[in-house]
């Protein structure tokens, strides 16, 4: 064992963490950025929370890193309590050791299956954070029901991004009841949100995303639960299908039904709230969280100013029109000079969000080459 620091929290973790042994406690240091962002986003949500008690659940605790950081680093004037569960007895033991290490008394630990823990706590938690290895689908139904408190928050990670991005089409259809679209990684998180919205709607619950990102090998989203059939209907109105023709996307409303050649359904509405993103960015900066977490939040802050589903991949676009790829910064400057909004995206070094049309980009790239060469 070794002791490390993440954010403002000390953690005892295995020297080597692996999923190959049944009794091994899993800790992934690569996900520190994920946890930095998560604490920042939940803090932004908590800043507007009006009740005296705030109850959270991390039902897939592992080493306890996520739940313990919530318990230790979130600032709240009322009573903040965190429930952490894991089916692995070795994990439960480590979680308890990490609680002692940080002298925390606001955490309850459960040696229990995640679905059992969540099902026992119907409508109890203000926040449920599903962070599995693989797909969140097996835990989603019980996670939704456990976070049905008024204005609750459902956080969800999927590490099966190859499935969500279309590498395993049949698996995606089977697990997420949707046809994936290859290419744009943002569509992975939109597909995941779309599935969650459909799952929640059967309980007359609407899910409203307030923050989403696709980083490394995972997709992550934070969704507010809103009670009422009307809220569920409003959430479903944001679902739709996408058809990709060359570099151009066509859209079709969910209520119109599926049509051959389209993929989805995807959540086509806003997936990150501008105020939440900005507040999360300020929190991450003020707490000196990792530079990478701050950089991702800064990019998402700029992205959220532009209403575009997905992005334009300049590398793919130039390949399609048979032009050399100009420096991305030059393309951005040209777009701004022509009165368009533009931002890089956090998940693709060649990706741009802009209110320009595809035809505008083609013209600007062609003009760039005619002047340059």
UniProtKB/Swiss-Prot annotation:
Transmembrane segments: none
Gene3D superfamilies cross-referenced by the UniProt entry: N2,N2-dimethylguanosine tRNA methyltransferase, C-terminal domain, Vaccinia Virus protein VP39
PROSITE patterns xrefs: SAM_MT_TRM1
GO molecular function, a single term: tRNA (guanine(26)-N2)-dimethyltransferase activity
Catalytic reactions on record: guanosine(26) in tRNA + 2 S-adenosyl-L-methionine = N(2)-dimethylguanosine(26) in tRNA + 2 S-adenosyl-L-homocysteine + 2 H(+)
Enzyme class label: transferase
Top-level division of the source organism's lineage: Archaea
Domain Trm1 methyltransferase: 2-365
Residues bound to S-adenosyl-L-methionine: 35, 66, 86, 113-114
Function recorded in the entry: Dimethylates a single guanine residue at position 26 of a number of tRNAs using S-adenosyl-L-methionine as donor of the methyl groups.
Family statement: Belongs to the class I-like SAM-binding methyltransferase superfamily. Trm1 family.
Protein name (Swiss-Prot/TrEMBL): tRNA (guanine(26)-N(2))-dimethyltransferase
